[in-house]
UniProtKB/Swiss-Prot annotation:
Disordered as annotated region, ranges: 1-27
Keywords in alphabetical order: Cleavage on pair of basic residues, Disulfide bond, Secreted, Signal, Toxin
Tissues/organs with expression: Expressed by the venom duct.
MF annotations from Gene Ontology: toxin activity
Gene source species: Conus regius
Propeptide: 5-36
Protein name as it appears in the record: Conotoxin Reg3b
Amino acid sequence: LTAIPLDGDQPADQPAERMEDGESTPNHPWFDPVKRCCTALCSRYHCLPCC
């Protein structure tokens, strides 16, 4: 078994963004575009993934 580090440009390297509340995660007020995650109120019904 060989482990290869992920390089960040493949779909498997970036978790799918789920939009269960009908809002687009990148447009969410708590979304940090630099870190590509949310900074507050992390839950399955709000901004995902959490920082």
